[in-house]
Design a protein with these regions (language model features):
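The catalytic core of metal-dependent phosphodiesterases that act on cyclic dinucleotides
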Residues: 110-183, 194-208
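Catalytic core of bacterial c-di-GMP phosphodiesterases, primarily the EAL and HD-GYP domains
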Residues: 26-32, 60-136
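Nucleotide second-messenger and two-component phosphorelay signaling modules
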Residues: 7, 11, 23, 41, ...
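The cytosolic transmitter module of two-component sensor histidine kinases
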Residues: 1, 65, 103, 107, ...
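Active-site core of bacterial EAL-family cyclic-dinucleotide phosphodiesterase domains
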Residues: 1-54, 92, 152, 208
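Conserved long alpha-helical elements within nucleotide-processing catalytic cores of c-di-GMP signaling
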Residues: 52-53, 62, 141, 189
Length: 208
């Protein structure tokens, strides 16, 4: 797998797609999320569900995270140099990457090399990646101090949501699909309504 991964990186077989984020209030695109797909040399597409778990197991996910981050920073840098308006493009970061030595320094350097504002590349962490402990707390504080905005992805899919909300400085809350699936029944509506209210009271934006 590692040999195939190295070859794929060299040939830029990992393709970054941008999924738009819309504001319900303004009906405008307010940003995007970077998604990655593996387009093999022979043209076949490999879904993230197939390769991400393998890369997480082998530790290759750290290199893929940085690859995607570099691509997004490059996109934002090119738009700035072309005089175009930039909107934030969020990038997912795995738990393995958070624990990787010098991760923050490496990511800060990439942002600075591309001459872009930190706010243009928010970092998304899943509940699992952001499971609260002292080490995670310190690392996340360093990321915020460096200038990054943090989004909690898949909120409501795990068991540590409230602890993470209470202890970690997230800017945006992204509701998990499992919550949205119950929006048509009364209890589901109440859960979503109060979750949004809680997030707003903490000064956080909410995405679904």
């Amino acid at each position: 797998m590692e040999n195939a991964f190295v070859e794929a990186i060299r040939n830029e077989e990992f393709v970054v797609y941008l999924q738009p984020k819309y504001s319900v209030e303004t009906e405008e695109i307010v940003g995007a999320e970077a998604l990655v797909r593996w387009k093999r040399a022979e043209g076949t597409m490999v879904s993230p569900g197939e390769f991400i778990p393998l890369f997480e197991k082998d530790g290759l996910i750290v290199r893929l995270d940085e690859y995607v981050f570099r691509k997004v920073c490059s996109i934002q840098g090119e738009r700035i140099r072309s005089g175009k308006k930039i909107l934030p493009i969020s990038v997912n970061l795995s738990r393995a990457s958070i624990h990787y030595d010098n991760m923050i320094c490496r990511y800060v350097k990439i942002v600075e090399e591309n001459g872009i504002p930190f706010s243009s590349v928010p970092i998304e962490l899943t509940e699992t990646a952001a499971l609260y402990n002292d080490r995670i707390s310190k690392l996340i504080e360093k990321m915020v101090d460096a200038g990054f905005e943090l989004h909690m992805d898949d909120f409501g899919s795990g068991y540590s949501s409230m602890t993470s909300l209470n202890q970690l400085p997230f800017d945006t809350l992204k509701l998990d699909k499992s919550l949205i699936d119950y929006i048509e029944n009364f209890r589901g509506q109440q859960v979503i309504r109060h979750t949004i209210s809680l997030a707003h009271s903490l000064g956080m934006k909410v995405l679904a």
